[in-house]
């Protein structure tokens, strides 16, 4: 299997895991506890189905952070999302 074929086969997994991690990160930034966090993570993951690309996730997280006084720019949220995506890709493409 070529790298391109692996990339196409794992794209959905990468996005789902990236969004899961983004939800955890943002939820913790919002001060959510163990009871609230799973629901919020699910909301973040669902937000990715609004439009192609990560923009919908970035906007949701940015709005949520701003609504609780956490002023983090969309650019910084996008950078965090990109770091998470890179990490997830490394995990999925690594071999034992």
Residue positions per predicted region:
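A charge-rich, low-complexity, intrinsically flexible signal that marks solvent-exposed coils, linkers
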Residues: 1-96
């Amino acid at each position: 299997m070529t790298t391109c074929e692996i990339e196409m086969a794992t794209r959905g997994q990468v996005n789902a895991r990236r969004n899961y991690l983004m939800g955890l990160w943002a939820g913790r930034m919002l001060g959510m506890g163990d009871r609230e966090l799973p629901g919020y993570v699910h909301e973040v993951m669902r937000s990715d189905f609004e439009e192609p690309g990560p923009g919908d996730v970035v906007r949701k997280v940015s709005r949520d952070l701003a609504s609780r006084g956490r002023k983090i720019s969309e650019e910084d949220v996008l950078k965090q999302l990109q770091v998470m995506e890179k990490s997830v890709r490394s995990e999925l493409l690594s071999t034992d």
